[in-house]
Regions:
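Serine-hydrolase catalytic core
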Residues: 67, 76-78, 212, 237-335
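Hydrolase active-site cap/lid region
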Residues: 185-245, 257
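An N-terminal hydrophobic leader/cap segment in hydrolases
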Residues: 11-67
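Alpha/beta-hydrolase active-site loop
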Residues: 134-162
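Conserved alpha/beta-hydrolase
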Residues: 110-129
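Alpha/beta-hydrolase fold nucleophile elbow
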Residues: 159-174
Length: 336
């Protein structure tokens, strides 16, 4: 009997190194995929304040700003100052885009509301980013809080009083929407400016992923060109190893359930793909009061608004602008 088993043992010993190499190869391949999609393809900005004559003609002064994130890295963005004491709005782009995609919308918000507007580049995005990789919402959440802290310390042109009042708004698309939602839900009570976004009163969230895992799956599909359930599952595991504990996967519904008092508008449309359904489902997760506004049949969303022309693009922008205007006006009205 022992002699009959020897060929099987020999075969097992022969195949074991092959199997080990196969596992290592698959693991290395998965880590390479995560490494690749964590570094979005960057492009020259679609438009900048300097290259868009219409902004200069209207006397708009959009400045380049830098500030520190909570982990010591440097963030950057454009700033358009509003009226002293007015609210501020932070615009957060989607994965694979950059701040220039939202420049026109932000200028319109400033002109209509007199709000200060900040356009950050999220991690790994924009021309020649100093932070080369995204974390699919983990670090971006604290980066948004750091952006709010930066806005709080701005002074008026006279240098005496704060430029921004006590109210803030977030507009975000996909990755930006998740970061805005997570930053608001994770805000601590006012008192620690570097870590609190508790003064956020209005949120416009366009095409929100159900979780960072879903966002990771969309990024994998976009970069590799196909969608495979097994590959997505393996990539999620590889992401946890790749980011060494810095990858978080708190779902959007849990985050939404923690909001208290913010006005929320959820937007999406057919061009957002599966994110349309995750956005629709998210509407059920907010506290009963105030209810979330929901429009998921838009012909244009934050995915395509930057390139939309004519009435559809104007309709989308007007929807966002009117929401912020009403939210800030209602919030400032004394209650009896």
């Amino acid at each position: 009997m022992s002699q009959r088993r020897r060929p099987g043992r020999r075969l097992l010993k022969a195949l074991l190194p092959v199997a080990l190499l196969l596992v290592l190869g698959v693991g290395a391949g998965l880590l390479f995929i995560v490494h690749t999609i964590a570094r979005p393809v960057t492009h020259p900005y679609l438009v900048t304040p300097e290259t868009f004559p219409a902004y200069s003609a209207r006397g708009l002064r959009v400045s380049e700003e830098r500030w520190a994130n909570a982990d010591g890295t440097e963030a950057r963005g454009w700033l358009l100052r509003g009226a002293e004491g007015a609210p501020a709005v932070v615009l957060l782009h989607r994965y694979g885009a950059d701040r220039s995609w939202l420049l026109n919308l932000g200028v319109k918000i400033n002109e209509a509301t007199n709000c200060t507007v900040l356009w950050p580049d999220l991690r790994g995005h924009g021309e020649k980013p100093k932070i080369t990789s995204t974390t699919f919402g983990a670090r971006e959440t604290t980066d948004v809080a750091a952006a709010v802290a930066f806005l709080r310390q701005l002074k008026s042109r006279q240098g005496q009083r704060p430029l921004v009042g006590a109210r803030f708004g977030f507009y975000g698309v996909e990755l930006g929407a998740y970061a805005a939602l997570a930053a608001t839900a994770s805000a601590r009570p006012a008192g620690n400016a570097a870590e609190s976004a508790s003064e956020v009163r209005a949120l416009v969230l366009d095409s929100v992923p159900a979780s960072p895992d879903e966002l990771l799956g969309h990024a994998t599909r976009d970069r590799l060109g196909f969608d495979n359930g097994l590959l997505n599952l393996l990539t999620r595991g590889a992401a946890r190893l790749y980011f060494l504990g810095r990858y978080e996967n708190e779902d959007s519904c849990t985050l939404a359930s923690r909001l208290t008092g913010q006005r929320v508008l959820l937007l999406s449309g057919q061009d957002a793909g599966k994110l349309r359904e995750s956005t629709r489902a998210l509407a059920q997760c907010f506290p009963a009061s105030p209810p979330a506004g929901l429009q998921v049949d838009l012909p244009v969303t934050g995915f395509t608004a930057s390139s939309a022309t004519g009435e559809q693009g104007e309709t989308y922008d007007r929807l966002v602008i009117e929401f912020f205007s009403q939210a800030f006006n209602e919030d400032s009205t004394p209650r009896r």
